[in-house]
Curated annotation (Swiss-Prot):
Glycosites: N2, N11, N17
GO molecular function term, any single one: pancreatic polypeptide receptor activity
Protein name per its UniProtKB record: Neuropeptide Y receptor type 1
Transmembrane segments: 34-54, 76-96, 116-136, 154-174, 211-231, 260-280, 299-319
Function: Receptor for neuropeptide Y and peptide YY.
Residues in the Cytoplasmic compartment per record: 55-75, 137-153, 232-259, 320-382
Pfam family, one: 7tm_1
Organism: Rattus norvegicus (Rat)
Tissues of expression: Brain.
A GO BP annotation: regulation of blood pressure
Keyword terms of this UniProt record: Cell membrane, Disulfide bond, G-protein coupled receptor, Glycoprotein, Lipoprotein, Membrane, Palmitate, Phosphoprotein, Receptor, Transducer, Transmembrane, Transmembrane helix
Sites of S-palmitoyl cysteine lipidation: C337
Disulfide links within the chain: C112-C197
Length: 382
């Protein structure tokens, strides 16, 4: 999924018609020029995503780390997710935007290799953090009396994720090159000592095998797994809610269950929607790049890439800012006030501390008062 974050210029045979005073490449056809209004709009959009992604994830990390009572399994995973999203916002957005517009690399050979490597690592860490959160919620809702992950398990899982992410991203370090090959036949002085950065695998089959592996590893595989977990959680919560409705008055029906279900569905939908355009673009480009018109390549890529990067802003909202505690602490964060420990009035944003040790038998035997207490305790802790 991360395979074409940079344009593979070696696949294009283009003729340049450029001004010596312009740092931007233009194709021979004037229709290939991106209007300044489009460039300006894209720059504003990328800037907004960078600001929101950095500030949102940074605030989320600081708030969780500041509060000892919030250091449960899910929040540990959320910090890991936010950190990886923070890396994407810093290492992915600005470099990719500038390079795509300029069509030549100005950040040096080290960054040429490091940038796609860090991007691939960050994306892999992000998706597998979502997988671990789905696993934890699945265990605590579907099998509350069974194995429960603790903080130690969370740290082990995070370590495994980072090792897997680094290992799966190493080909970018090995095969990413910095070369002036596309500019060797350009006589204009403006393009002297200009370089491009792209991946050059031993063969097309090697490249397609690797990019297909990333497609499964970073998108389809995790997404299917997450969907299954949350679907089972949704069914269990709905069934539990229906069982409680049979013996309690309708006025006790909690809206929190609906909020949880909507949040769970939104998590999956947001990830799938944000990454789907770039996934399709990368897949088409990898297998038959000629389908994409040369003039439309950069614009299509930037739009797809920008949509994917919006996920770095969405995750803090779903996992943090919809929670009342984060909203309160966020005010302290932006007002530069000290955080106060509130053991009594804190709610836990995740399902990791839910007291759900209730079987069908106990539900059937419980009284209406007990049902109200059980259901409200569960929902208030989410």
């Amino acid at each position: 999924m991360n395979s074409t974050l940079f344009s593979r210029v070696e696949n294009y045979s283009v003729h340049y018609n450029v001004s010596e005073n312009s740092p931007f490449l233009a194709f021979e056809n004037d229709d290939c020029h991106l209007p300044l209004a489009v460039i300006f709009t894209l720059a504003l959009a990328y800037g907004a995503v960078i600001i929101l992604g950095v500030s949102g994830n940074l605030a989320l990390i600081i708030i969780i780390l500041k509060q000892k009572e919030m250091r449960n399994v899910t929040n540990i995973l959320i910090v890991n997710l936010s950190f990886s999203d923070l890396l994407v916002a810093v290492m992915c957005l600005p470099f990719t935007f500038v390079y795509t517009l300029m069509d030549h690399w100005v950040f040096g050979e080290t960054m040429c290799k490091l940038n796609p490597f860090v991007q691939c690592v960050s994306i892999t860490v992000s998706i597998f953090s979502l997988v671990l959160i789905a696993v934890e919620r699945h265990q605590l809702i579907i099998n509350p009396r069974g194995w429960r992950p603790n903080n130690r398990h969370a740290y082990i899982g995070i370590t495994v994720i980072w090792v897997l992410a680094v290992a799966s991203s190493l080909p970018f370090v090995i095969y990413q090159i910095l070369t002036d090959e596309p500019f060797q036949n350009v006589s204009l002085a403006a393009f002297k000592d200009k370089y491009v950065c792209f991946d050059k695998f031993p063969s097309d089959s090697h490249r397609l095998s690797y990019t297909t592996l990333l497609l499964v590893l970073q998108y389809f595989g995790p997404l299917c797994f997450i969907f299954i977990c949350y679907f089972k959680i949704y069914i269990r919560l709905k069934r539990r809610n229906n069982m409680m409705d049979k013996i309690r008055d309708s006025k006790y029906r909690s809206s929190e269950t609906k909020r949880i279900n909507v949040m769970l569905l939104s998590i999956v939908v947001a990830f799938a929607v944000c990454w789907l355009p770039l996934t399709i673009f990368n897949t088409v480009f990898d297998w038959n790049h000629q389908i994409i018109a040369t003039c439309n390549h950069n614009l299509l890529f930037l739009l797809c890439h920008l949509t994917a990067m919006i996920s770095t802003c969405v995750n803090p909202i779903f996992y943090g800012f919809l929670n009342k505690n984060f909203q309160r602490d966020l005010q302290f964060f932006f007002n530069f006030c000290d955080f106060r420990s509130r053991d009594d009035d804190y709610e836990t944003i995740a399902m990791s501390t839910m007291h759900t040790d209730v079987s069908k038998t106990s539900l059937k035997q419980a009284s209406p008062v007990a049902f109200k207490k059980i259901s409200m305790n569960d929902n208030e802790k989410i």
